[in-house]
Every structure is written in C-alpha cells, then in structure tokens.
Amino acid sequence: VTFHTTRWTLVRHATGRSAVGRQALSDLCAAYYEPVVAFLRREGRAEDAARELAHEFFRKLLEKPALEGAAPALGRFRSYLLGALKHFLARERERSGRQKRGGDAVSVSLDAGTDTSPGLVLADSYELPPDEFFDRQWALAVLDRAFAALAGEREAAGKTEDFARLKPWLTGDAAHGDQAATARALGISEGALKVAVHRLRRRFRELLKAEIAQTLDSPEAMAEEMRHLFAALGGS
C-alpha cells in the first residue's frame, strides 16, 4: 500500500472542494456506514430512525469543504468519524426543531450501491461503553470488507466452490476431524489442504492490512491499529 494515496491521506490533504478528496471521503463513509448505524441504534433508536439519522450525519459530513482545522495527530479515519459523530449528536440534542439547510449547500450523498443492510453485531456488544462499542463494530466492518474482497478474488479465479469448503478455516467454524473430509471433497491430500488453508489465511491478512491502510495516513500506524482492532474484537 502506498500511503501517499490511501483514501484517508487523500482526504486529509485535500483543500477546499477538491473532487478527489471528496470522492475519497465519500468512499470511506460508504465503507463504514454500518458502524455508525450500530452506534446510533445503541442509544435506543429503531432501525429505520438510526439509518435516517446516519444518512443525515453523512450528508452533513460530505458537505464540508475539507477537513480544515483537523488535528494533525488525527491520523485515523476511525477516530475522526467517531469524533464527528459525537459532535453531530450533541448538535442534534441542542436543537428544538429541524434546522433548515442553507441554500448554498452542496448535496453529496453516499453512492447508490452502498450496502445499508444490517451488519455483524456481537450479542453482548451493547454492554460495552460507547467508544468501545463503536470500535468493535468498526473492527467487524473491516473484517467483513476484507473477507468480501477475498471471496471476490476466489470467484474471479473460478474457485468459488473450493473457497466455500475452505471458508470454515478462516471463520473458525471448522470442527475437529473436518480436515480429512474436506481434503477428500477437494480431491487433494491433507498436507495440500494445510498448505491451501495457510495461503488463504495469508492472503486474507494481506487484504485486511490493505483495508486498514485505507483508513490511515502513515505506515507507522498500521501495527498499532491492527492491535487495537483485534483487542476491540476480543473485548479487551
């Protein structure tokens, strides 16, 4: 990954109404729409109400000319998005009625193809403090996107069926004793199956790092961000 051209770097260095920066921010918002909805639902909102408010939040976020005045240390889109969401909610609570949009507002919305279906939510997630809850939903979204990218690669290579059989070793759903049966189904030895699983895991990790990199502005932050997200998944 070239950190000079990650989506978050393009956003951070955009000036005014830079088309490149605005598109990069729109892409990031579309990618991480679901953690925002989950955060809003955690506060007791119904599904439809949370999604409507999420769209309003992203609309306002995308109308900003640029991240003017953003703290230099804000090198993670995750941190920026959560801070912006908290600020938005504080403003919403202060309003006694709906604020009318200005006539000079530029309307920018999420792409029509944005997946707004419910994402992964761990059963006990609502028991976490708000920030930790958001980070866990964020981590789940990162994993989901990396997994989807891997599935897309296998489909493009004509390996959809093989991937479906190997998938349990990525998700942790493979039961003891499944290895021999899977090897027979694929027509390979158990040794070859172990190699295939190892390669698949390695590729998944590469795609995971690539996905995380798009939300950072420096390679130095990668190791820390990965540790943070895995800790969020573990609840520790």
Regions found by a protein language model. Give the residues of each.
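Intrinsic, short, N-terminal disordered tails of RNA polymerase sigma-factor systems
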Residues: 1-236
